[in-house]
Amino acid sequence: MKLPYFLLGLAGLAAASPMGLAERQLSDGNELRDGSCKPIIFIFARASTEPGLLGISTGPAVCNDLKMAKAGQVLCQGVGPAYTADLMSNALPDNTSPAAISESESLFKLAASKCPNSQILAGGYSQGTAVMDDSIKQLPDDVKDKIKGVVLFGYTRNAQEGGQIGNFPKDKVKIYCAMGDLVCDGTLIVTAAHFTYVMNTGEASQWLESKLSDTTTSSLTGSSSSDTSSSTSTGDSSSESSSAAGLGGLSGLTGLGSSTSGGFPSLASLF
């Protein structure tokens, strides 16, 4: 039965931002490849089934926030097209495909080589968090040093990596794991909580801005002075709790088992 994978796909389709689709798509998400350098480069990996390179929820929201705060200084790049954001890749050992990991690595290296004076910010949602984790931890140190901050929404490798990105400074990572989002516990069980992260994008954008050096000057209104709000955190890499209010009708979405051997279940166990 393939219904559980359909439910996992809802994570990408149901996490709609309150703002309109057209308003959220101010960037085509291919600005690093197609454009000239700017002081800040934001690289993002979308959730499973989300269209485009940035997706239609958390990615465009953070991109737009950063562009509003740092007018004319930000370019946004989504991971794709090699990263297809397909459902089946969630069950692979790295919780995403080798092609996606390789493409993400290449984008970070491109940012560092094409724009050596730029600061890099990054993020991911759902399967996109695995893309970020698996690619960033493999980067050479000189490229890692250029990455100032990473935000992860619904971190699918949160349990496997101990609430951080492997081989990367914890104080450069902000993890949002909503209360009741079981993918953060190392499962493929999708609940309503996994759809709530658009509520965290404003704070996430402010946190990313706070990690930048003083080479850029404008500031997001109401920037947070702390890495956490109403959440429990471990060090600087924190797990945020967010409410599933308004999504109670989806709260019964379950159906996938717990992970084994550090990854998600084998494909055979999902049908």
From Swiss-Prot:
Cellular compartment(s): Secreted
GO BP term, pick one: carbohydrate catabolic process
Catalysed reactions, semicolon-separated: cutin + H2O = cutin monomers
Positions of disulphide bridges: C37-C115, C63-C76, C177-C184
Keyword Secreted: yes
Coarse class of the protein's main subcellular location: secreted
Annotated GO CC locations: extracellular region
Positions of region (Disordered): 216-245
Keywords tagged on the record: Disulfide bond, Hydrolase, Secreted, Serine esterase, Signal
Site note Transition state stabilizer, residues: S48, Q127
Single GO MF descriptor: cutinase activity
EC number per UniProt: 3.1.1.74
InterPro entries, per database record: AB_hydrolase_fold, Cutinase/axe, CUTINASE_2, Cutinase_monf
Family membership noted in the UniProt record: Belongs to the cutinase family.
Free-text function comment from the UniProt entry: Catalyzes the hydrolysis of complex carboxylic polyesters found in the cell wall of plants. Degrades cutin, a macromolecule that forms the structure of the plant cuticle.
Entry protein name: Probable cutinase 2
